């Protein structure tokens, strides 16, 4: 086990929008180390969002992430011979990471032609409270609510 917690590295703001969130999204979209391709996808999707809404795409993205971020999640806790799903609050950094992960995961499962279209539409859906990534958050909250009886097994 690690002696100390690994230090958090500062996130470099992206050159186009000057936003840390966009940098994190680029890194989540990244596959096989092809960063320029990931940047092209993210910037293309954000341009499409701006085209469709006329609003600053970073604000749209942040609104979408706000709708995806979970407040609670369940973690497995072994007590005696039984494993309980214990609801715990999600730290802000983890909530952000989960939101980005779910956004990209469900973007990849969409049926539009290009990744740019998929990402743009998933961001717009999430910003409007629709889409698979928002449903995932609701499911996570339902799980936590269903297992509320085990909340006293907290860490």
Curated annotation (Swiss-Prot):
Subunit structure: Part of the 30S ribosomal subunit. Contacts proteins S9 and S11.
Organism the protein comes from: Corynebacterium diphtheriae (strain ATCC 700971 / NCTC 13129 / Biotype gravis)
Protein's job: One of the primary rRNA binding proteins, it binds directly to 16S rRNA where it nucleates assembly of the head domain of the 30S subunit. Is located at the subunit interface close to the decoding center, probably blocks exit of the E-site tRNA.
Gene name, Swiss-Prot/TrEMBL: rpsG
Matching CDD domains: uS7_Bacteria
Gene Ontology CC terms: small ribosomal subunit
Entry-linked SUPFAM superfamilies: Ribosomal protein S7 (SSF47973)
A Pfam family that the UniProt record links to this protein: Ribosomal_S7
HAMAP family the record matches: Ribosomal_uS7_B
Classification via InterPro entries: Ribosomal_uS7, Ribosomal_uS7_bac/org-type, Ribosomal_uS7_CS, Ribosomal_uS7_dom, Ribosomal_uS7_dom_sf
One MF term in the entry's GO annotations: structural constituent of ribosome
Protein name per Swiss-Prot or TrEMBL: Small ribosomal subunit protein uS7
Family: Belongs to the universal ribosomal protein uS7 family.
């Amino acid at each position: 086990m690690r002696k100390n917690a690994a230090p958090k590295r500062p996130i470099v703001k992206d050159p186009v929008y000057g936003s840390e969130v966009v940098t994190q999204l680029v890194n989540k979209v990244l596959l096989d180390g092809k960063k320029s391709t990931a940047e092209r996808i993210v910037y293309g999707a954000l341009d499409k969002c701006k085209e469709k809404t006329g609003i600053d795409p970073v604000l749209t993205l942040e609104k979408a992430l706000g709708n995806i971020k979970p407040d609670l999640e369940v973690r497995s806790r072994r007590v005696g011979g039984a494993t309980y799903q214990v609801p715990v609050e999600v730290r802000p950094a983890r909530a952000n990471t989960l939101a980005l992960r779910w956004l990209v995961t469900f973007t990849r499962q969409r049926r539009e032609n290009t990744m740019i279209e998929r990402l743009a539409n998933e961001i717009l859906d999430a910003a409007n409270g629709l889409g698979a990534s928002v449903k995932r958050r609701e499911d996570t909250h339902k799980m936590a609510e269903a297992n509320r009886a085990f909340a006293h097994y907290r860490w």
